[in-house]
């Protein structure tokens, strides 16, 4: 039992009573007994029982002069029906108050409570009633009772907000049949308060396709306390074009309903708003009147609980019993119109061309058709006519894997055969197998596993239309019914599996889908590429806005599941009555899916044969084995190589691992086992990063959006080990979907990503007023390990020297390089990551992870991410070069040798310090004493001898001087000696010379014996020779 609220009279304010008031009138607010006595007094005054201020008698009241309403319910659940005079009416003799229906009474749908007799009556034609409910399905303007409150950083934003990027312009926007949420990063609440006399429920329909907006619905009481904190307030995502429904039970009393959205804008892409329509609230008391049908609708039966929409080319006014038809030749109208519109002259935007299926002659015709429904006129001035159809062209060949059997259609090749589309299907040669998949590059008819559709969230103009049309060498978006239609193209593939020879492989990639496209737009068109896994939920993988040149995009499939790939094209997101962007379109030239289950083959590839006999059927190779070309037998890949996921034929299918890496057991991936070796200046450095193999985390920020929303970048890094498994996990916690799926062990959850490096955006709880921090926008930064080296460049990934501070030691940094196999519009080669491991003995344990100061988000271009990981665990293992020995003193015949680390110590673990060494030795104390004594004695002796010889020398000098003086005095007294002349020619043969000099030995002897043997000194004087001697 519901009553329908429309326009400004539908809503109820905060704390209003439960009864639905009559239009333009307010119910009483006082308690029942006060109201009764007050009205009785008024009636007595009007009847003349009490003194009146005017002596003029009042006319008696007629039924048209007053209306009935109920008082508030008292504590016993009772109320009174009282008569209330209409405004600007003066009369006397109002009916007395009578006891009313119980407070929980209500009428059925299609009925109203006739207050005079207090009985339920059916609504008449042109009106409707919802009984004890209230419904909001008209959103031309915000209905009465609803309010918008925009908040930012827990601050209510009012009209006085003068910030240029404030939230004063953020609100829910009525769009006719639905209401649309904000698109910015403000928090906007759509609020409605209702007072229920009995338990009921609230029900609404919604579209919520973009997880960059947080959408929550919750209920509070009149004390602003949540009614049920255990209820999940997060609304689940819906598929594109799907209207989901949400309902919550309501308790009796005041219920304040909140539809709250918060946009998270971290990039330049615009978010898709939340849409809400058909809000129904059950549990209000009664309605005292039926409501007329809104314009564009009608009700032709008594007791209706809703109104029907007028069909196309008809219209109706308010309260209509039937719809009036427009003039067929000159007017038209859409469904639910309140008036007819004149038909405009036809233009080139009113028709489109298609290609007919091939006929038996292999020809296709170009046909021109008016856009349906046709609303233009050809008979007006300046109107164009439809171009002639029927021009024939040669049909394109069949798509690869299909053949033409002489009919006008193409058929898939039987299993085990292949065709390029121009020839008959042929069986694959011995030793080969079909390369299954789909390759659509000719578009004469829509393939059997594809379908197209059109929908609009605000109308049903294009329901049943083809969203896309084939056009020979491409397929293009169709005309649709409005410029804001979603034109949908779906491709369904039941699963993916590797070739037979690779069945045992454990590689992550199972297949890939590639499409070539271009967009031609004059407005804000958008092409969405979406993926649905196992028919659970459709997620937008990538989108392109505006005009885009012809390009290819590849999406990799990592698991075997049922996939539905969707291309959705929208010319503009603003709905308009006239067509302005009909010529905006998207063209897809080819779609290729590899390794598709139930696919067809355009070629054959080599496979491994059984060893029993030549030409036997294909057999799967064990993991890590390739097919040898000479024998077509399986052979294991060499060490330190991994098997290509695209082909296994030939030894070249085994791709060498990068530096510092090794293959896992299955040769499916290369990984680092956390050990690294490097030669430096004839010294071998050994690193062991095992203690850093667990996931390292970094919370970077904070950063702020244009409106000031604080958020953080959260990174998880799985450095090495674990046999190459991706241990870093990032999740979105907007709903509890992830937790439930993880507990259940399902592989279908999409809110969780695993990689070597991943990133999430964290919104702190205080930033948006949430009870807990929110994690969203989880992306994979690295899912493939490239290598580890001390060099700063590896496979086009370069770490600039000024990216991080210069190290303080001579220990080289070790660099781990990764990449992501998923390409994006901004990173056509995928993302890449470099992790610089730096030895820092002061950072114990897991150490510290940081990002470049120049790139606080970890990346400067959005494609390459850099991290510096400092830890003592990043130091090399200790060797004999990292310590030195210290010898102690010899004590008691023993000597100790100690070993200590070099300072500062730049190594960990490795070898340990040797034990102290104890060796025997000769004590040096005694010899030191002997040496000291001998030295002292020698010194004294030398001093004594010096003094002695000095004294003796003084005496000798004195005696010599005395002797010389004595000799000189005697020579003076003697007469002169005669001399004999020597004649010329004679020889002096008798000349004898006696020396007075002694040798050194003689001197020593004389000194030793002089005192004892000779008390006289003899001095030989030199004299001239005389003849008497």
From Swiss-Prot:
Topology of this chain in the membrane = Single-pass type I membrane protein
Report the main location listed first in the record: membrane
Residue pairs linked by disulfide bridges in the UniProt entry: 293-310, 323-346, 326-358, 674-720, 730-758, 827-863, 839-875
Cellular component terms, GO, for this chain's entry? membrane; plasma membrane
Q: Name one GO biological process term.
A: negative regulation of nervous system development
Q: Which residues form the MRH domain?
A: 672-877
Pfam families this protein is in? ELAPOR1_C, GBD_ELAPOR1, GBD_ELAPOR1-like_3rd, MRH_ELAPOR1_9th, TNFR_ELAPOR1_6th
Topology, Cytoplasmic side: 951-1029
Subcellular localization: Cell membrane
> Which residues are glycosylated according to the annotation?
169, 405, 691
For the modification Phosphoserine, the affected residues are: 1018
Tell me the Gene3D superfamilies matching this sequence.
Mannose-6-phosphate receptor binding domain (2.70.130.10), Tumor Necrosis Factor Receptor, subunit A, domain 2 (2.10.50.10)
Q: What residue intervals traverse the membrane?
A: 930-950
* Oxidoreductase is among the record's keywords: no
The UniProt record lists the keyword Disulfide bond: yes
Signal peptide range in chain numbering: 1-47
Extracellular topology: which positions? 48-929
Protein family: Belongs to the ELAPOR family.
Q: Which PANTHER family match?
A: ENDOSOME_LYSOSOME-ASSOCIATED APOPTOSIS AND AUTOPHAGY REGULATOR FAMILY MEMBER 2, PROTEIN CBG13728
Q: Please describe what this protein does.
A: Functions as a regulator of the BMP signaling pathway and may be involved in epidermal differentiation.
Descriptive protein name: Endosome/lysosome-associated apoptosis and autophagy regulator family member 2
Which species does this protein come from? Homo sapiens
The coding gene here is ELAPOR2
């Amino acid at each position: 039992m519901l009553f329908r609220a429309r326009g400004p009279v539908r809503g109820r304010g905060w704390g209003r009573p439960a009864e639905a008031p009559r239009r333009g009138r307010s119910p009483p607010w006082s308690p029942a007994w006060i109201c009764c006595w007050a009205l009785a007094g008024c009636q007595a005054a009007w009847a003349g029982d009490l003194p009146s201020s005017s002596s003029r008698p009042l006319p008696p009241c007629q039924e048209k002069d007053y209306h009935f309403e109920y008082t508030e319910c008292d504590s016993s659940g009772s109320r009174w029906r009282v008569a209330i005079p209409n405004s600007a009416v003066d009369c006397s003799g109002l009916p007395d108050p009578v006891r009313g229906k119980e407070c929980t009474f209500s009428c059925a749908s299609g009925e109203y409570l006739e207050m005079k007799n207090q009985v339920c009556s059916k609504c008449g034609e042109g009106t409707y009633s919802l009984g004890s409910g209230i419904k909001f399905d008209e959103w031309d303007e915000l209905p009465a009772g609803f309010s918008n409150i925009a908040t930012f950083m827990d601050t209510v934003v009012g009209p006085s907000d003068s910030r240029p990027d404030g939230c004063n312009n953020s609100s829910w926007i009525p769009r006719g049949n639905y209401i649309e949420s904000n698109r910015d990063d403000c928090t906007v609440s759509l609020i409605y308060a209702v007072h229920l006399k009995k338990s009921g429920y609230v029900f609404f329909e919604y579209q919520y396709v973009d997880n960059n907006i947080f959408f929550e619905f919750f209920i509070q009481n009149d004390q602003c306390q949540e009614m049920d904190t255990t209820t999940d307030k997060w609304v689940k995502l819906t598929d594109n074009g799907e209207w989901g429904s949400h309902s919550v039970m309501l308790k009796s009393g005041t219920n304040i309903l909140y539809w709250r959205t918060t946009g998270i804008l971290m990039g330049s892409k615009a978010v898709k708003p939340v849409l809400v329509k058909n809000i129904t609230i059950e549990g209000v008391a009664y309605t005292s009147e039926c409501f007329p049908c809104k314009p564009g609708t009608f009700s032709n039966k008594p007791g209706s609980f809703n109104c029907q929409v007028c069909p196309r080319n008809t219209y109706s006014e308010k309260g209509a019993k039937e719809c009036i038809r427009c003039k067929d030749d000159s007017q038209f109208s859409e469904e639910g119109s309140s008036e007819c519109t004149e038909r405009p002259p036809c233009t080139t935007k009113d028709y489109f061309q298609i290609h007919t299926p091939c006929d038996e002659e292999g020809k296709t015709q170009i046909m021109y058709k008016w856009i349906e429904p046709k609303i233009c006129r050809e008979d007006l001035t300046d109107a164009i006519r439809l171009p002639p159809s029927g021009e024939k062209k040669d049909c394109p060949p069949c798509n690869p894997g299909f053949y033409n059997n002489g009919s006008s259609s193409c058929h898939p090749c039987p299993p085990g055969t292949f065709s390029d589309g121009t020839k008959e299907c042929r069986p694959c040669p011995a030793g080969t197998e079909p390369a299954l998949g789909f390759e659509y590059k000719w578009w004469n008819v829509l393939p059997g596993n594809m379908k197209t559709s059109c929908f609009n969230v605000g109308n049903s103009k294009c329901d049943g239309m083809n969203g896309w049309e084939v056009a020979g060498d491409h397929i293009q978006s169709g005309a649709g019914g409005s410029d804001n239609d979603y034109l949908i193209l779906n491709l369904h593939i039941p699963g993916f599996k590797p070739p037979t020879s690779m069945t045992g492989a454990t590689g992550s990639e199972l297949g890939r889908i590639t499409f070539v496209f271009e967009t031609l737009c004059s407005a804000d068109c958008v092409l969405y590429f979406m993926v649905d896994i196992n028919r659970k939920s459709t997620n937008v993988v990538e989108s392109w806005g505006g005009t885009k040149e012809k390009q290819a995009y590849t999406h990799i499939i990592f698991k075997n599941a049922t996939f539905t790939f969707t291309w959705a094209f929208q010319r503009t997101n603003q709905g308009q009555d006239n067509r302005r962007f009909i010529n905006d379109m998207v063209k897809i030239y080819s779609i290729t899916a590899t390794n598709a289950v139930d696919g067809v083959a355009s070629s054959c590839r080599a496979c491994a044969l059984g060893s029993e006999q030549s030409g036997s059927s294909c057999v799967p190779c064990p993991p890590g084995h390739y097919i040898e070309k000479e024998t077509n037998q399986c052979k294991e890949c060499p060490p330190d190589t991994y098997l290509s996921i695209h082909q296994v034929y030939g030894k070249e299918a085994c791709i060498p691992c990068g530096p510092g890496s090794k293959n896992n057991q299955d040769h499916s991936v290369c990984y680092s086992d956390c050990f690294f070796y490097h030669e430096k200046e004839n010294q071998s450095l050994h690193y062991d990063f095992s203690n850093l193999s667990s996931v390292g985390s970094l919370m970077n920020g904070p950063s702020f959006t244009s409106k000031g929303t604080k958020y953080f970048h959260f990174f998880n890094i799985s450095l090495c080990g674990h046999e190459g498994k991706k241990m870093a996990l990032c999740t979105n916690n907007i709903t509890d979907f992830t937790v439930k799926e993880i507990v259940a062990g399902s592989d279908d959850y999409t809110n969780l990503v695993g990689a070597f490096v991943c990133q999430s955006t964290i919104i702190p709880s205080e930033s948006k007023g949430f009870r807990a921090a929110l994690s969203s926008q989880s992306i994979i930064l690295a899912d493939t390990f490239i290598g580890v080296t001390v060099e700063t460049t590896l496979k086009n990934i370069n770490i600039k020297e000024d990216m991080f501070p210069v190290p303080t030691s001579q220990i080289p940094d070790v660099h781990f390089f990764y990449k992501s196999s998923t390409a994006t519009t901004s990173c056509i080669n995928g993302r890449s990551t470099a992790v610089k491991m730096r030895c820092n003995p002061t950072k114990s344990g897991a150490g510290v992870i940081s990002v470049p100061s120049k790139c606080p988000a970890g990346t400067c271009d959005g494609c390459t991410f850099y991290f510096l990981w400092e830890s003592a665990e990043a130091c090399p293992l200790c060797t004999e070069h990292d310590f030195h020995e210290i010898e102690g003193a010899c004590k008691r015949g023993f000597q100790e040798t100690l070993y200590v680390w070099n300072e500062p110590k730049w190594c960990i673990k490795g070898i340990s310090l040797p034990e102290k060494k104890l060796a025997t030795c000769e004590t040096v104390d005694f010899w030191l004493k002997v040496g000291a004594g001998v030295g002292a004695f020698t010194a004294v002796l030398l001093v004594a001898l010096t003094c002695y010889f000095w004294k003796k020398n003084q005496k000798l000098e004195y005696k010599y001087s005395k002797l010389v003086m004595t000799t000189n005095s005697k020579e003076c007294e003697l007469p002169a000696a005669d001399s004999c002349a020597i004649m010329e020619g004679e020889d002096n043969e008798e000349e004898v010379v006696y020396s007075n000099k002694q040798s050194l030995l003689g001197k020593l002897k004389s000194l030793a014996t002089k005192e004892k043997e000779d008390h006289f000194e003899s001095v030989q004087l030199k004299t001239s020779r005389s003849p008497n001697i």
